[in-house]
Amino acid sequence: MAKQVFKKIINNQELIVEHGQLAKQASGSVLVRYGDTVVLVTATVNNKLSEVDFFPLTVVFQEKLYSVGKIPGGFLKREGKPSEYGTLSARVIDRALRPLFSENFRNEVQIVINVLAVDNDNDVRMVSLFAASLALSISKIPFAGPVAGALVTVDQKNNIIINPTLEQINDGQMELIVAGTDEAINMVEAGAKEVSENLMLQAILAGHDVIQQLIAFQHEIIAKVGVPKMEVELFQVRPEIITYVNNNYAKDLITAARIKEKTKRYETIEHLIEQAIKNYPMPVSLSEKEQKQLTVELKTALHNIIRQEVRRQILIDKTRLDGRKLDQIRPLSSEIDILPVVHGSALFTRGETQVLSVVTLGALGENQIIDGITDEESKRFMHHYNFPAFSVGETGRMGPPSRREIGHGALGEKVLLQIIPSEKVFPYTIRIVSEVLESNGSTSQASICAATLALMAAGVPITAPVVGIAMGLIKEKNNYTILTDIQGMEDHLGDMDFKVAGTATGICALQMDIKIVGINKAILQEALKAAKKARLTILDNVLATISAPRTHLAPTAPKMKTFMIPVDKIREVIGPGGKMITAIIEKSDDVKIDIEDDGQVTIYHKETTAIEKAYQLIKAIAMPVVVGEKIIGPVVKIEKFGVFVHLKENLDGLIHISKLAKQHVEKAEDIVQLNDIVKVKVIEIDGKGKIKLQLIEILPKK
């Protein structure tokens, strides 16, 4: 197969696709370059039908640290398990691709993204999504694409920027990922600085304009190198099974679906499913594999009855499983100070969804070190989300976080990061853990609400409280209904999970996943409007529990003292091989000390006496004088701009001419003379250690 190269200018930069040279044994493969970002993406299908009752799609995002000129850290010096960024990138791409496969397609498909080179100006996730869609589209794999994505930000003047650089994202009002087909949007992921619903909608639609260009380019390539799609056996339920289920269990299943209490509803449905399988006249001649397949068909037919009834209720009757109105939020409950000892805790309950969030404060030196392909080297704010099986009344796996738990934690972190105070304002590392205790839908948004409460209870001076809500959609052709605060079954049987989080002022994060091909502007607009109304209602509940962050930290939280030392004294404070700083820590009851490059020193400990001891030890080395201190010394030099006073050994300070007297002074010699003994006050020590003084009085000569 000869190598073929395709090129197109997208957003003033060349997008290059190579096909036919690399990874030729995969079902589809492309090498895509945009700027200096290069990815090799393969799509492979298993020709045998799997025995699972869902479409087995896997997206693997392989970060190679050589792509950014790094050698991996650690003892092994090679890539290990995916980083958080890799996991989240794979989820974004998966969410854009999955709606474009038939739900009855049961052959295993694996997308492998090899990140080969990365620059700071071209987002590797968007290049990877484009390449993944193209690899699928030119292959034999049945795929209703192509699909593409765009990265969008909005600058401070509300100008929309497509495919922004890292600097533009950091300076902008949002980081928005939009994905979709040429006709509709099917995935949105955004973090934003309290933007309006209208501005967010404009940015989403602007991103879709670029998506259409990318899809047109894919169509050009598909026409030249695409191959016919494979003949596949789509999963389907046999007519006799549908008849058996409808005749014997449809009425009871519909009644069960209307039970308001989740646990009772699920138990009743599960019992009916067990009875249907047990009572079905299973031919004894069937093999174990055939019996398993028939059981899957029975379960599917039974679940389809529930699905049709729930969707009919919402679309036609405009009623919901638990009797709520379409825009009604479940009962809300908020509590703080749930736990002793910890630095901050809160419990948030919405219906049968309940989350406990706990805040822990630590020294800046306890931040998370990141070894990946992004420019981020560390972070001082973390939000971790745990979803144990008991939260849905089941037994199950306990261990490292799943991809879903990582994703939900990251969404909460994206929201909360917008309201976390800067390091200068609040020099602590902050970790929040959200423990899901009960789940009936939208636990990620409940964790945001609980985390906000816990932060305020902990005394973290957040800029504004933030809460979240999950919206849903039921759509049949042109008839659709939007739901506020979806519960688990509405999420499972619906067409959209649309999460919106923000403050009273605006949106801080947005995440949309759908199961249909896409949605239009009108649905987006309506969902955003309803989400804002719900958000403000939840915010009232949070503020009724605690109206503002506490002005003090918990007694168990580490106390801290921050001060500046001259930059040229940092080395002396640390000492050769760290001996001096180690000695200070040991003499001060194991305090934690952080020293920044600009000379900012922060000392942490539970006891103020230990902090003060460490402060005095550092001061003796690096700060022979402090602001406010009064010192007597001789005038050693006179200049046009002021006079220098000798303070201590190897240490002089400057009295600027404007600080010699209250009235205007023409010449310094009009006030003081060389060798005069003066009393001065230290008024400032700048970042370079230069000492500025104010004259108090000239002492009489002896």
UniProtKB/Swiss-Prot annotation:
An annotated GO cellular component: cytosol
Keywords carried by this UniProt record: Cytoplasm, Magnesium, Metal-binding, Nucleotidyltransferase, RNA-binding, Transferase
Subcellular location: Cytoplasm
S1 motif domain segment(s): 628-696
Cofactor: Mg(2+)
Binding annotation for Mg(2+): 491, 497
EC number: 2.7.7.8
Catalytic reaction(s) noted: RNA(n+1) + phosphate = RNA(n) + a ribonucleoside 5'-diphosphate
One biological process term in Gene Ontology: mRNA catabolic process
Protein origin, superkingdom: Bacteria
Major subcellular location class: cytoplasm
Annotated KH domain residues: 558-618
Pfam families the UniProt entry points to: KH_1, PNPase, RNase_PH, RNase_PH_C, S1
UniProt record similarity statement: Belongs to the polyribonucleotide nucleotidyltransferase family.
PANTHER family registered for this protein in UniProt: POLYRIBONUCLEOTIDE NUCLEOTIDYLTRANSFERASE (PTHR11252), POLYRIBONUCLEOTIDE NUCLEOTIDYLTRANSFERASE 1, MITOCHONDRIAL (PTHR11252:SF0)
Protein name: Polyribonucleotide nucleotidyltransferase
Source organism of the structure: Spiroplasma citri
